[in-house]
Design a protein with these regions (language model features):
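Hydrophobic beta-sheet segments that form the core/acyl-binding groove
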Residues: 3-5, 13-15, 19-23, 93, ...
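Short coil/turn connectors at secondary-structure junctions
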Residues: 5-6, 11-14, 33-36, 89, ...
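RNA pseudouridine synthases
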Residues: 12-13, 19-21, 25-42
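A generic local secondary-structure boundary/capping motif
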Residues: 1-9, 23-30, 57-61, 75-82
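Catalytic-pocket segment enriched in acidic/His residues
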Residues: 47-164
Length: 164
């Protein structure tokens, strides 16, 4: 189980982009050439550690067990061959079998090429680096013992049970 000490833990189903080769100053039109694959990320947020607008929320996201990924890595070519783009995938979260999030990658604020262009402009992306792409509406507080399943079409189901 994912173990977190908090009264306010939210889940976030996100497409995780896995960088496949070193990327620096990449243009959007070439961005997919740098993707090795895709996986599911559950980017838990511990909301009782939220500070304020003027301080980074480092403690909200950066905790042991807070960002499980999986269930496996799907090769970028497979996603592009079958779906045309990672921007054509449905996302869903269930909590104890009840659908709580349902969305689509085409509705993301920034598409994958935009994110790669942006980040590679000021940092070198290395093979294995992850870019998490954002979550659809429907995030709710989780409780100990709840089973959270974050799913992305063409990738799979990531299953976590929230522990203390």
């Amino acid at each position: 189980p994912t173990k977190l000490k908090s009264d306010a833990v939210d889940y976030e189903c996100e497409l995780a982009v896995v960088i496949g080769r070193t990327a620096k100053h990449v243009k959007k039109e070439n961005a997919y050439d740098y993707v090795g694959g895709y996986t599911v990320a559950n980017d838990y947020a511990i909301r009782d550690y939220l500070e304020n607008w003027y301080r980074p929320n480092f403690r909200v996201k950066n905790r042991d067990t807070c960002t499980p990924i999986g269930p496996w890595l799907v090769d970028a070519k497979d996603i592009h061959d079958i779906y045309g783009s990672p921007m054509n995938l449905s996302l869903q979260t269930t909590v104890n079998g009840k659908i709580t999030q349902s969305g689509h990658t085409r509705d993301m604020i920034f598409d994958v090429p935009t994110l790669i262009e942006y980040f590679s402009a000021f940092m070198t992306l290395q093979p294995g680096d992850l870019i998490l792409t954002g979550t659809p509406d429907g995030v709710v507080n989780c409780e100990v013992g709840k089973v959270i399943v974050t799913s992305i079409e063409g990738i799979g189901d990531l299953i976590n049970t929230l522990g203390e």
